[in-house]
Amino acid sequence: MNPALPEDVKNLLTDLETFILDVLKGETLSKKAKEKKEVLIKRLKDIKHSYPQDFQDKAETDDQEENDGFSLPPDAVSIASDRDKDEELPYDGSFYPSVAAQDLDYLRAGYLEKRRKDHSFFASEWQKRWCVLTNSMFYYYGSDKDKQQKGAFSLDGYRAKMNDTLRKDAKKDCCFEILAPDKRVYQFAASSPKEAEEWINVIMNARGNIPSEDEELYDDVNQEMDASHEEDIYEELPEESEKPVTGSETPKATPVPVNNTSGKENTDYANFYRGLWDCNGDHPDELSFKYGDTIYILSKEYNTYGWWVGEMKGTIGLVPKAYIIEMYDI
């Protein structure tokens, strides 16, 4: 029997095998390169046969590590060995049950490149994944036909933003990340900057549109109050009274006097919110605020677009509702 191979040599051979069989699989190779590839594959097989004691348990061990606690059904399209090696338990320690990609009721779905948390020298850093976004969850699969996800996480507490520092190639401006304080960061690359922005918008609206019991109660009880409140605002502007603001127009924040809330801000605790994250307005009619800032909500007219009208320190503007949270538990 041949002596055992050193551990670093075994790791090198494993990385080389991954590079040849996985990384080069989708590449267009010349005839000479294909011949060289076949020679290397044959030599790797010969080495395995010469050192069976070093490779006999490899397949079983890999399956156990890569399954990451999920059981794979017999008819699954995904192969266990193709499972992301960088997957980990969800942040809250819970398991999400297996669900087929085609069984999900989704807000958006499509192929993205997902960045692996850890990758070896030969392994690909970015992997093509079929991503599915529901009202509260983000799933990713090897393909849209998979019977079980490669990973999933709850959107609770997460937000999404562009990040042009993740890559240096042509997709530099197509990258975005989904992140939250003290949680794992998930990074993706779309096919275009526009597609990346669309994913971000859907993610932010999805995580912001998860209604709590208090929010549902508030919407029912205070619907009449909101309508009368808006009438008070526009009665002070006679030149605007004949042309009320519609859902397709941007409300003009600066002409509205600060004292036109008729004293409601002193007792209307349900309309007091605080900043959940820092927010810098991209346009003059958007309100800029920081984490913890107090904001009084004047109107929820643009709720379907993910925006409210708020007032802070005498300034009135549009506020992304996903960036604020109720100040009082009423």
Swiss-Prot record:
* Signal peptide range in chain numbering: none
For the region Disordered, give the residue spans: 53-77, 228-261
Q: Which UniProt keywords apply?
A: B-cell activation, Cytoplasm, Phosphoprotein, SH3 domain
Q: How is it modified after translation?
A: Phosphorylated on tyrosines.
Compositional bias segments (type: Polar residues): 247-261
Q: Which Gene3D superfamilies match?
A: 6.10.250.220, Pleckstrin-homology domain (PH domain)/Phosphotyrosine-binding domain (PTB), SH3 Domains
Where is each PH domain found?
105-208
Question: Where is the major localization of this protein?
Answer: cytoplasm
Q: Its family? A: Belongs to the SKAP family.
Q: What is this protein called?
A: Src kinase-associated phosphoprotein 2-A
Organism name: Xenopus laevis (African clawed frog)
Gene name in the database record:
skap2-a
